[in-house]
C-alpha cells in the first residue's frame, strides 16, 4: 500500500516536470523566433507563456499545501518557475537545466558560450549575461564554483539576479511557508 502512494507521487512529479519542460520549450521557441515575428506578437506570446507559468505555479501551491511530502520534491520546480517569472534568467535553456539540476550540461553550456565569444559568434554582453545565469544556477544548486567564477559572478550579477538569490534562498530551508511566500512575492513583482 505504501508503494502506491510513492508511485502516484512519482507520476505526479513526472507530469509536473513535463509541464515545466513544455512551458520552458515554449519560452525558448519564442526567443528563437523573435526575429521572425513582430514585436507585438513577441510581447503577446511571451506574456501569454509567462501567464501560463503563473497559473502553473498556482496549481503547485495548491498541491504543496495539501501534501507536505511533495514540498521538497516540488521545490526545485517552484524555484525554476520563479526564475522564469521574475526573469532573473533570460535563457530558457538555463532555466530548464537548472530545474533538472544538471551540473554537467550547465558546465558544457558555459564552455560553449566561452568558445562562442572567442570565435565572435556572440557579443561580449551576451557572454556575460549567459555566464552569470549559468554560474548563479550552479551556485544556487550548491555546486562548487572556482574563485575566478565566484569573482566573475560577483562582478557581473544584476539586481534581478541578486533578488532571485535572496528570495530563492528561502527554498533551501524546505518549509512550506517560505516556498509559498517566496512564490507570492515573485508573482507580485513580476506582475508590476
UniProtKB/Swiss-Prot annotation:
GO molecular function: beta-catenin binding
Keyword Coiled coil recorded: yes
Keyword Coiled coil: yes
A Pfam family the protein falls into: ICAT
Coiled coil: 6-65
InterPro entries according to UniProt: ICAT_dom (IPR009428), ICAT_sf (IPR036911), LZIC (IPR040065)
Keywords: Coiled coil
Family note: Belongs to the CTNNBIP1 family.
UniProt cross-references to PANTHER family, sorted A to Z: PROTEIN LZIC
Name of this chain's protein: Protein LZIC
Organism: Dictyostelium discoideum
Taxonomic lineage: Eukaryota, Amoebozoa, Evosea, Eumycetozoa, Dictyostelia
Gene symbol of the encoding locus: lzic
Amino acid at each position: 500500500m505504501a508503494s502506491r502512494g510513492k508511485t502516484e507521487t512519482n507520476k505526479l512529479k513526472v507530469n509536473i516536470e513535463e509541464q515545466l519542460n513544455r512551458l520552458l520549450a515554449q519560452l525558448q521557441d519564442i526567443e528563437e523566433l523573435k526575429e521572425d515575428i513582430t514585436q507585438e506578437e513577441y510581447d503577446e506570446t511571451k506574456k501569454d507563456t509567462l501567464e501560463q507559468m503563473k497559473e502553473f505555479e498556482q496549481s503547485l501551491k495548491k498541491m504543496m499545501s495539501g501534501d507536505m511530502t511533495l514540498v521538497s520534491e516540488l521545490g526545485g520546480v517552484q524555484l525554476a518557475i520563479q526564475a522564469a517569472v521574475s526573469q532573473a534568467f533570460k535563457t530558457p535553456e538555463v532555466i530548464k537545466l537548472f530545474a533538472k539540476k544538471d551540473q554537467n550540461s550547465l558546465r558544457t553550456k558555459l564552455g560553449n558560450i566561452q568558445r562562442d565569444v572567442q570565435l565572435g559568434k556572440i557579443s561580449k554582453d551576451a557572454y556575460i549575461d549567459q555566464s552569470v545565469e549559468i554560474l548563479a544556477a550552479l551556485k544556487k544548486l550548491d555546486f562548487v564554483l572556482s574563485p575566478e567564477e565566484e569573482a566573475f559572478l560577483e562582478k557581473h550579477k544584476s539586481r534581478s539576479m541578486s533578488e532571485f538569490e535572496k528570495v530563492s534562498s528561502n527554498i533551501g530551508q524546505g518549509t512550506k511557508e517560505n516556498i509559498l511566500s517566496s512564490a507570492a512575492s515573485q508573482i507580485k513583482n513580476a506582475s508590476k
